[in-house]
């Protein structure tokens, strides 16, 4: 059972974070939080999203899960005002979630959880390098890199104390180095991995709204992006597998 009220901004930020990677997911809820963990169809990227009950203006729930069609939730956006309060309600055993705001009432059919890809296990991999930069800065580099290539290198250069993003195309290239004064660095450890820009553009659009994004990185390992939503009452983690170039 779930009965909750949430602002339109937080609702949209949450749905957008999920839709950057997946079209459907299991949504879990308990007395204290709502959470989802899902991978894309190619098993290349993962999202782990949590909203504490404090993200809601009203929250009442018992432990359970439902299968969400994220595209259907996005279809409700067009009628939402920025100041709208969104009422969400699901009765235990029902196959619908009720979404109500400003006189509108959507009754959205749920997906069978058994038909949705199983929740992935959170990876236990240790990524030695870590930097924190603004989400908008990160997205700007990704957009610029997409003009010249479909892939981008992320690197930490400890000797220079720089976090470097660069892309190489057939004839052009782009490089952006963030100095120690531009980033918050927890670990200036050597790191360098190559990633698909297609995935990063979708993630980056979501991350562009975050004041700070923490990036954990290794050598030819996945990258992890962590950032807050809902005024600090929510957390999103994206993990993206590297592209391995043939010698």
UniProtKB/Swiss-Prot annotation:
The keyword DNA-binding applies. Keywords: DNA replication, DNA-binding. The keyword Cell wall biogenesis/degradation does not apply. Transmembrane segments: none annotated. One of its GO terms (biological process) is leading strand elongation. One of its GO terms (molecular function) is DNA polymerase processivity factor activity. It holds the Pfam family PCNA_N. Coiled coil: none annotated. Belongs to the PCNA family. PANTHER family: PROLIFERATING CELL NUCLEAR ANTIGEN (PTHR11352:SF0). Homotrimer. The subunits circularize to form a toroid; DNA passes through its center. Replication factor C (RFC) is required to load the toroid on the DNA. Sliding clamp subunit that acts as a moving platform for DNA processing. Responsible for tethering the catalytic subunit of DNA polymerase and other proteins to DNA during high-speed replication. NCBIfam families: PRK01115.1-5 (NF002222). This is DNA polymerase sliding clamp. It comes from Methanospirillum hungatei JF-1 (strain ATCC 27890 / DSM 864 / NBRC 100397 / JF-1).
């Amino acid at each position: 059972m779930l009965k909750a009220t949430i602002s339109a901004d937080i609702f949209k930020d949450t749905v957008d974070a999920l839709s950057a990677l997946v079209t459907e997911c299991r949504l879990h809820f308990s007395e204290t939080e709502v959470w989802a963990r899902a991978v894309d169809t190619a098993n290349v990227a993962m999202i782990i999203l949590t909203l504490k009950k404090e993200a809601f203006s009203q929250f009442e729930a018992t432990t359970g899960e439902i299968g969400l069609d994220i595209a259907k939730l996005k279809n409700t956006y067009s009628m939402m005002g920025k100041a709208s309060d969104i009422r969400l309600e699901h009765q235990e055993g029902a196959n619908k979630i009720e979404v109500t705001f400003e006189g509108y009432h959507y009754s959205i059919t749920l997906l069978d959880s058994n038909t949705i890809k199983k929740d992935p296990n959170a990876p236990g991999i240790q990524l030695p390098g870590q930097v924190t930069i603004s989400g908008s800065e990160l997205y700007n580099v990704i957009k610029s890199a997409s003009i010249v290539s479909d892939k981008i290198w992320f690197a930490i250069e400890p000797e220079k104390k720089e976090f470097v993003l660069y892309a190489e195309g057939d004839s052009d290239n782009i490089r952006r180095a963030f100095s120690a004064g531009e980033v918050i660095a927890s670990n200036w450890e050597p790191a360098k991995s190559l990633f698909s820009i297609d995935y990063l553009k979708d993630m980056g659009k979501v991350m562009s709204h975050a004041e700070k994004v923490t990036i954990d990185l290794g050598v030819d390992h996945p990258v992890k992006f962590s950032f807050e939503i809902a005024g600090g009452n929510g957390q999103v983690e994206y993990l993206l597998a590297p592209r391995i170039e043939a010698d």
